[in-house]
From Swiss-Prot:
GO CC terms, sorted: cytoplasm
Compartment(s) of residence: Cytoplasm
Classification via HAMAP family: UreF (MF_01385)
Job description of the protein: Required for maturation of urease via the functional incorporation of the urease nickel metallocenter.
Molecular-function annotations in GO: nickel cation binding
Gene: ureF1
Quaternary assembly: UreD, UreF and UreG form a complex that acts as a GTP-hydrolysis-dependent molecular chaperone, activating the urease apoprotein by helping to assemble the nickel containing metallocenter of UreC. The UreE protein probably delivers the nickel.
Family as reported in the entry's similarity comment: Belongs to the UreF family.
PANTHER family for this protein: UREASE ACCESSORY PROTEIN F (PTHR33620:SF1)
Domain of life: Bacteria
Name under which the protein is recorded: Urease accessory protein UreF 1
Amino acid sequence: MIIITPITNDPTTALLRLMAWLSPVFPVGSFSYSHGLERAVHDGLVVDAAGLQDWLQWLVRRGSGWNDAVLCAESWRCAMKGEDLHEIAELAEALAGSRERHMETMLQGGAFLAAARSWPCEIFDRLPPDCAYPVAVGAVAGGHGVPLAQALAAFLQAFCINLLQASIRLSVTGQSGVTAIMAALEPVLGETAARAALSSMEDLGSATFIADIMAMKHETQHSRLFRS
């Protein structure tokens, strides 16, 4: 039996959908990716909670997290306006700076679209079968009428939480350190989500070159826990 899931104007329903879609248990395989953090830990660039917090906040403010938020916002707008999503999908894929970053965003994007079909929506017919993760999240959120600012804040928080989970497995910090970082990052996530909501494609760009290099170096790391 197919259940038609309508666009929501109810804040509680929107919140519930975001919590489901961006939950660590949503089947996108995010637990298997470290976004280059594993290599940064291996090379001694991130050794404690303070360094981890700094690493994450710059990824969000000026790195891949920021670019993904801009792409997510543009995909949301295209979905809301009924515009074509293939161009933004192609751009998002092209912006993946290394083989593992490409794998990370494309596999998660495809898995997200497959799982999100439990909430039927016409947006799935307008998306390419292979789609980068931020485009998938933004388009589905827009297709369901989830408010943009909320979608971006949840997306960025999920990005950080996944890397915080990875940091525990990498013995950078423990659960108490992770919760402290989560609390400390709230202003960063809120401010970045607000900026991304007002962004355009001209705002794409990052300056976290070391993080990008770590993602590349991870490809040849002999012993590792994560796929990226």
